[in-house]
Amino acid sequence: MDIAIQHPWFKRTLGPFYPSRLFDQFFGEGLFEYDLLPFLSSTISPYYRQSLFRTVLDSGISEVRSDRDKFVIFLDVKHFSPEDLTVKVQEDFVEIHGKHNERQDDHGYISREFHRRYRLPSNVDQSALSCSLSADGMLTFSGPKVPSGVDAGHSERAIPVSREEKPSSAPSS
């Protein structure tokens, strides 16, 4: 009689609450079996499992912060250079577009493209918006907020992406 040895309850996947990479923003990277079948992955390959906390930290999901003084967007775009990125402000929205043509990588040829659109708060000073790309591929879009009653100046314009040589100081969630 064969008896299946199960992992302790605290090492098993958490079912629908287990973070999957399926909707992460790893533009063009491959999917693994646990991305598509998180319930079965521990039974198919019980000795290989990505850490729950590492998955959450490396998820690549953009983060938007809006506090009293400023508005900031952090977006992981590690596969793109500043020349591949376009950041535009149109009315109350910021649009971030990244595209690079087909290039060769370790497994063949790949091309990537993404679009993100975020609503700007009405009190963000659009004349002082800035955008930078850190050495580790974190795009930071930020703008100061103005006191209520002051015109924030809404117009359509492109925001240049500057390159920083130091790694990002973005939150690690």
From Swiss-Prot:
It comes from Ovis aries (Sheep). This is Alpha-crystallin A chain. The modification N6-acetyllysine is found at K70, K99. Contributes to the transparency and refractive index of the lens. Acts as a chaperone, preventing aggregation of various proteins under a wide range of stress conditions. Required for the correct formation of lens intermediate filaments as part of a complex composed of BFSP1, BFSP2 and CRYAA. Glycans are attached at S162. The gene is CRYAA. Residues 1-63 are annotated as: Required for complex formation with BFSP1 and BFSP2. Residues 153-167 have a biased composition (Basic and acidic residues). Zn(2+) 2 binds at H107. Residues 52-162 form the sHSP domain. Residues 144-173 are annotated as: Disordered. The modification Deamidated asparagine is found at N101, N123. GO terms for cellular component: cytoplasm; cytosol; nucleoplasm; nucleus; protein-containing complex. InterPro entries: A-crystallin/Hsp20_dom (IPR002068), Alpha-crystallin/HSP_16 (IPR055269), Alpha-crystallin/sHSP_animal (IPR001436), Alpha-crystallin_N (IPR003090), HSP20-like_chaperone (IPR008978). It comes from the Eukaryota. One of its GO terms (biological process) is mitochondrion organization. Acetylation at Lys-70 may increase chaperone activity. Undergoes age-dependent proteolytical cleavage at the C-terminus. Zn(2+) 1 binds at H100, E102. The modification Deamidated glutamine is found at Q6, Q50, Q90. GO terms for molecular function: identical protein binding; metal ion binding; structural constituent of eye lens; unfolded protein binding.
